Regions:
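Conserved Class I S-adenosyl-L-methionine-dependent methyltransferase catalytic core
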Residues: 37, 42-160
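Conserved class I S-adenosyl-L-methionine
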Residues: 165-175, 193
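Conserved SAM-binding loop of SAM-dependent methyltransferases across substrates and taxa
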Residues: 176-188
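S-adenosyl-L-methionine
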Residues: 209-255
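A short acidic, Gly/Pro-enriched loop at the edge of an enzyme's catalytic core
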Residues: 252-267
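A short glycine-rich, Lys/Arg-flanked "PGG" loop and its adjoining helix->strand segment in the class I
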Residues: 281-293
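Conserved beta-strand signature within the Rossmann-like core of class I S-adenosyl-L-methionine
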Residues: 294-303
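Core SAM-dependent methyltransferase catalytic element
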Residues: 327, 340-364
């Protein structure tokens, strides 16, 4: 369902590595019997899919509880008769923004998950909402207000690729998916698979790529003017929808994507290799095995490592290139640029990041 025959035959079980049967609504492994479900229309190809669904529903429950607590606290504070009218307006506007944002997340993601579950003490908030929700605004809305970060990324990649014929492409850690969408549209991809482990971004992205107009409210506590406390954006695919026959979503482990060796002409890692792989050389081996002979790997992102990463593994560009060479790749053109990152038109705040972009081809 939703996967063309060629790629469907290349899917592999996340548990045992055997071929998957993907022609029925429930995907099943012919060897170990593991069954996989779909979250909405997205196959969940993770080793213990039911456990992940339970976690996601508990995260949704925690998000709902904390958002309602925050909204109640803001409204209670706004009810203080000693507050100035401007402060009351600001607090109430922020409360409305938080409430709208929660409602939109529940409408889009909650319905796909099957609703919330009571969180456990160990349950944490979903990173897709807490840390990465701004990617949805940036990818699918801010461009209408003049933000050029998406164009900046595609221009950087276009400047290093040796040919604009990406063929069958895998994007690992695709997040909100605008880069994957643009690469497919403009750099000659014939079929694209996107992989991520976070449904809170992916369910939004899948709806947008398929052609839906999704509303999502941006709210900020860092206020310069009362008119900039919150704004509801229309998230849309700027160049029209992409269908299930050419653009495929998979909730799966990006460190071990569930595909047979030699499946892809191009593998893309956007803002991924510095943050996610605990064993970067091991991950490079996985990238190598996924590429067919003559394929290429495209990387685009900074070198910003987790705070708990050993300093010895916070590789410089030169060290990274040495690891890439040892993994059997040849680096083609590359560039490093300081680029604007998540500069919101609402707040006019954001970051500058040094971003490394390169193409590498397997040589053995």
């Amino acid at each position: 369902v939703g996967v063309v025959e060629q790629l469907r035959k290349r899917l592999r079980c996340a548990r045992c590595g055997a071929a998957l049967e993907a022609e029925t609504p429930d995907i099943a492994c012919s060897r170990c019997g593991q069954k996989y479900f779909r979250l909405g229309r997205i196959p969940v190809l993770l080793p213990r899919p039911d456990d992940h669904l339970t976690l996601w529903r508990r995260q949704l429950g925690l998000l709902m509880a904390q958002s309602r607590q925050m909204t109640g606290a803001l409204e209670a504070e706004a009810g203080n008769p000693e507050l100035a009218e401007g402060a009351k307006l600001r607090l109430n506007a922020l409360a409305h923004g938080v409430r709208d944002q929660l409602r939109q997340i529940v409408d889009v993601v909650g319905s796909a998950l099957g609703g919330p579950l009571e969180p456990q003490e160990s349950t944490g908030l979903p990173r897709g909402v807490v840390e990465y929700s701004y990617l949805l605004y940036r990818d699918w809305a801010w461009e209408k207000a003049g933000n050029q970060e998406c164009q900046q990324s595609i221009d950087s990649i276009r400047s290093v690729v040796t040919t604009e014929k990406l063929g069958r492409m895998l994007v690992v850690g695709a997040g909100a998916c605008r880069l994957a969408y643009d690469l497919h549209r403009f750099l000659g991809a014939t079929e694209t698979a996107v992989v991520d482990i976070d449904p809170f971004l992916f369910v939004f992205a899948e709806a947008i790529v398929r052609g839906a107009v999704v509303q999502f409210t941006e709210a900020s506590t860092t206020v310069q003017e009362l008119s900039r406390i919150a704004r509801t954006w229309d998230l849309t695919a700027p160049d029209g929808p992409l269908g299930e026959d050419v653009f495929h979503f998979f909730l799966a482990n990006g460190l071990s994507p569930p595909f047979a060796d030699g499946t892809f002409d191009t593998v893309v890692t956007p803002w991924f290799i510095d943050q996610v792989p605990p064993d970067l050389p091991g991950f490079l081996t996985a990238v190598h095995r996924l590429l067919r002979p003559g394929g290429r790997w495209i990387n685009h992102g900074p070198l910003i490592y987790p705070v708990d990463a050993p300093i010895s593994r916070r590789y410089s560009r030169e060290e990274l290139f040495d690891l890439v060479s040892r993994a059997g790749f040849r680096i083609e053109p590359w560039r490093g640029d300081s680029q604007r990152h998540l500069v919101s038109p609402l707040t006019e705040r954001g970051k500058m990041e040094w971003v490394l972009t390169f193409e590498a081809q397997p040589v053995k």
